Swiss-Prot record:
Changing residue 382 to A: Reduces activity 10-fold. Pathway: Protein modification; protein glycosylation. The keyword Manganese applies. One of its GO terms (biological process) is polysaccharide biosynthetic process. Its cofactor is Mn(2+). It is a single-pass type II membrane protein. It comes from Arabidopsis thaliana. This is Xyloglucan 6-xylosyltransferase 1. It is found in: Golgi apparatus membrane. The gene is XXT1. Coiled coil: none annotated. Binds 1 Mn(2+) ion per subunit.
Amino acid sequence: MIEKCIGAHRFRRLQRFMRQGKVTILCLVLTVIVLRGTIGAGKFGTPEKDIEEIREHFFYTRKRGEPHRVLVEVSSKTTSSEDGGNGGNSYETFDINKLFVDEGDEEKSRDRTNKPYSLGPKISDWDEQRRDWLKQNPSFPNFVAPNKPRVLLVTGSAPKPCENPVGDHYLLKSIKNKIDYCRIHGIEIFYNMALLDAEMAGFWAKLPLIRKLLLSHPEIEFLWWMDSDAMFTDMVFELPWERYKDYNLVMHGWNEMVYDQKNWIGLNTGSFLLRNSQWSLDLLDAWAPMGPKGKIREEAGKVLTRELKDRPAFEADDQSAMVYLLATEREKWGGKVYLESGYYLHGYWGILVDRYEEMIENHKPGFGDHRWPLVTHFVGCKPCGKFGDYPVERCLRQMDRAFNFGDNQILQMYGFTHKSLGSRRVKPTRNQTDRPLDAKDEFGLLHPPFKAAKLSTTTT
């Protein structure tokens, strides 16, 4: 009927259009079904609800994506900041100063206008207190053998790292050197890194520490102070303890330079022995008043420069104060002070280090004097500071030589030596053997007689 009305050709076109329309409608239905499954069409499935939920879905997706991008950006920035600012896993790029920011402002100097500085409460009966303690604690004798006092070697460094990149490495070498000597000679060692009194910084920091250790360790007969820039270079030399039986303070120095000339370098306080006694506590009390930093130390420095021979103008230091104290009050203190010049309790590095090869060729360790110095002290090098009084390269090379000079005496016990005094590398000095106890200990350091315990030996 329709074909007759519109014609055969148009009828076929209409049929084709209807077939295509069915396919289009079918695709549309399938699309809606898929969208309803993925996006959702609400509880009722109405067109209005479909449109509303589609709109909410895309709004939620956009809203959720924005904070995600923010988090990604913040995370990226944080990672970048950690890697760049703090160094991440790299010690090389990490700013070490962040770890050493002081917890608070430095302690302010107290007003000393009317009251002199004191190291602590006045003690007047220390000899009696100590004697009673030793009687009550016989297992901690102050002498470990006849003429062999119990000795505590004390040294230390600042709480913070050195101000130059290699300073801490040389501090490590220095303490290793001291540990070696103390182990061989049966000496206890204490390494300090705490500033016990902020007023007594710098040269003077040792005084509060020394007093505290004397009072805390009554079993110690002698305290041996040694600066961190001093090294043992004669590992064999044993101090002549018998020589000091009537003395309480032993320092490297010369009577004429201290008492007659009042020369500020007439003695050295970088390495000295102090007996644990009431006399020593009184000396520390008399020594300390020039130490507080600030105006007191500055004014005291002017007095010392005026009174002592050849002293430059700078704030009061512990060495100049000791020279001044002994020179002006010799009757009170001089009788118990031994100024040692028979060996190098302190040896100035500038006149010693270049002669090490000559010493090796002509002498052996055990003298402690100019032939083989007990201590080589690098005065003025200041290996932990920013600036020294001598060229840095010269100081560091000479410190390496001094360390190796002493270290060779340790290594020889085990059959090794440094290839040269300037070399870190070592070489064997003897062949290995299946009878190691037959190996020769050239300097007698493996089992020195002064370390032998008076005990019976049992074997199983």
